Every structure is written in structure tokens, then in C-alpha cells.
Amino acid sequence: IYRKHLKYIGATSPGELCNESYVAGVGTYPEDIGLEGLSMVITQLIGLHIGLTYDDVDNCSCPRAPCIMQPEALSSSGMKTFSNCSVHDYTHYASKLDMQCLGDLSNVLQPKQSVCGNGIVEGSEECDCGNETECQFKECCNHETCKLKGSAQCGSGTCCTPKCELSAAGTPCRKAVDPECDFTEYCDGSSSHCVPDTFALDGHLCRLGSAYCYNGRCQALNDQCVSLFGKGSQGASYACFEKVNSQRENLANCDSKNSYSLPCGQKDVLCGKLACFRPNKNYKSSTQSVLYSYVHGSVCLSIPPGLSMRSDGKDNAYVADGTVCGPQMYCINGSCKEVNFTGNDCNAAKKCKGNGICNNFGHCQCFPDYRPPDCNLQIGSPGGSIDDGNLLRTDSALATKRLSQHADSWVILGFFIFLPFIMTLFLGIIKRNERKIVPQKEQER
């Protein structure tokens, strides 16, 4: 439950973990704490539920203060541990019969059975190309049994060829959708499925430092306007955003998750509905409803919510998450938040030696001629990371590449060495033939 002002962190039934009538709890999400603080709220509620109590700071201690079951833990950052009092409480509670339900495995949920035909390889399935209509690998995979046919190596996936063979290692299987914030993934030669998506760590600077990468895309305000209103449109001024997002009307909303009107607070004006300058003075939209606002002699464009939805459920009428809203700040869920890097330990300058950037797995995405995982110099390396599936950066592959390059170089060098010799020989033959022809003509005279 979200609460703007904190009066309590939640409610649960202390020590009633195995009581089916009370095995529940409710936690609050105060405005002034981040995800780390919320995780402590949940941890403390679970602790109370299994019989722990709040620590007495005078009698309880832990290796690094504050301890988990202390109220101060909600507002502090960094690793935390349980105190000696919490360990004692748990040992005492676990020794009683009140926790015997934890040893009862009769009600453990069984893994979901695989469903043949849903396009997802599960359980004992060898392949799953979808139902009869969807299956594009009918020569490779039996869509009714999800078993491979004959000698087929694969029967589904982006790294499976029409000949039922695994794609060669290094074959691109997912192209980058953004030149700065997303990366191409490759088949690894051993799986028919592409590796998980890799992209720049959220908060990485793009567009010459004017925007942030977020979820694999450079969230530049101008790009969002171009996608809605066409080439030439640009992000509007602060005055336009204030006009569009501060009025109390049905179409002024800083919270796209709710159906009611919620004008933006002053600090969140740039994170509400998207406001853009028109591409040109004669701009008219024939494909969608456009709202026109006039501010200080400028025309600001916006659209009503719900008319331009993305495949991920987000509404293009609103500023995208990750868009800059101030110095070291970007928009998250309609609010202007400080860019927070406390959740990752990847420092590109140190970990990648300045020869790459951090990706969403916290690993280095190296520039060309630098080899992962540490981005050490290696001429000929395609760069990338240990996560993108490209195995063609191994020592043997690079050695083969260099030998091939050297062989080509020797062929070219040999050609240029022997070319003058061949030309000299050819010219000599021509001269000799000319000398033979001249005496014959003199004898004929």
C-alpha cells in the first residue's frame, strides 16, 4: 500500500506463521524511502511473522549497525544483518511446535506441467514451435508431441535454421534496437534460442550526454516527440509542460495508472503528459486527436491518454521512464527522481578500464578491439560482453582470424612481387618477336 506520510510500516500477526487464519501481512510504501527501504519494510514484517521482535538498541548488537530489526534500518543504506537478539528469538520460536508447518512438504506447490503448443520449451519437451498454424518448423518438430523429428538438431527458436540445424556460433539472433543503449545478441552454437537481451545499464549517458539510457533505449525527449508528431517536432519548453500538466482537467494527468485526473506536482511537471513543439507552422494531424495549447506565443502539442499504446502497455501520451527532468534526475512512474546507482557495483572507468560500458547484468560491454570480461586490449576482438552469446572472440577464433588475415596478406604481397617479373617477361617476348619480324621484311625486299 502506498502512503505519502509514514505512520506505520504495515500490519501482521506476530509469531503466527503456521496459523492459516493469520498467514498474511500488509506493508506500506512511504514516499520518502526507495526500493532498499521498502525491502527492509517487507523483511521486518516477515521477521515479526516468524516470531522476531524489534531490537532493543541497548541490549542487541550486530556486526554492522543498524541491525535489520531496528527502526533505523528503513532509512539507512548498505548491507544489514540480524542481531544476536533476532537469532535468539528465532532459535526459541523454531524450537517450539509452532513452526512445524515449515517441515511439512505435503502442500508444496508442484511445478507447472509443460504445455505442448504454447511456443515455450518446458519440462521434457525437446522443442515447441507453437500450434499447427503457428509452427514454422514442421519438418523439424512434431507440434503435437513437442519431440524432434528424425535427425533434427532443433525444432524451434531463433537460432534454429530451416534445415533443423543449430545456427553457427556468432550468428546474430537479436539486432540492437538502439545504437547507443542496446546491443546485438548472437547464437552461441549450442542452443536453438537466443541469449537474454543485453543493453546498457540504466542511467548510462547517451545523445552526447543529454539523455539517459533506460531499458535499452536512449530516452531523449525529442525522439519521443518525433515518434508521435513526425520529423521536425521537438520537446516543448517547461512553460508548455506546466500548462499541459498542472491544470485540473480530465486530460491533465501525472499518473497514467489511474483513471482519475491527477495534476502533476511542481517537481514532477516534466514527467507527466508529453508536450512537444509542432514540426512546422502548418502542421495538421490527420491520424489522431491532437491537443493544442498556446503558451508565450508558441503552440504546444499533446495527445489524450489511451490513443497510442505500446506493446509493453505503456502510453505514448506520457513522458517515458528514464527521460531527463533535471540535473542528475530522470522520470520514473510520473515522478522526477534522482538517478540512483547504489544498486549496482559496476564502475565502467575501473571495471572496464574506460574501454567499455556497463550492461544490465553488471558486466563490461567492451568496445571493438577490447576483449571481455575486463576490456583488455586485443586487436581484432569484436568487443561485446560475456553475456551477448558471441563466442567468436575466443583465442582460437581470433588466432584463426589472424592466420586468415596473414594468409591473405601473403597472397597480396606475392602478387605484387611477381607482377613486375611477369610484366618484364611478357615485354621481353614481345621485343624478341619484333626482332624476328624485321629481318624477314628486309629479305623480302
Swiss-Prot record:
The keyword Secreted does not apply. Residues 1-106 form the Peptidase M12B domain. It is found in: Membrane. The prodomain and the metalloprotease-like domain are cleaved during the epididymal maturation of the spermatozoa. It comes from the Eukaryota. Expressed specifically in testis. One of its GO terms (cellular component) is membrane. Disulfide bonds join C18-C101, C60-C85, C62-C67, C173-C194, C346-C358, C352-C364, C366-C375. A tripeptide motif (ECD) within disintegrin-like domain could be involved in the binding to egg integrin receptor and thus could mediate sperm/egg binding. This is Disintegrin and metalloproteinase domain-containing protein 18. It comes from Rattus norvegicus (Rat). The gene is Adam18.
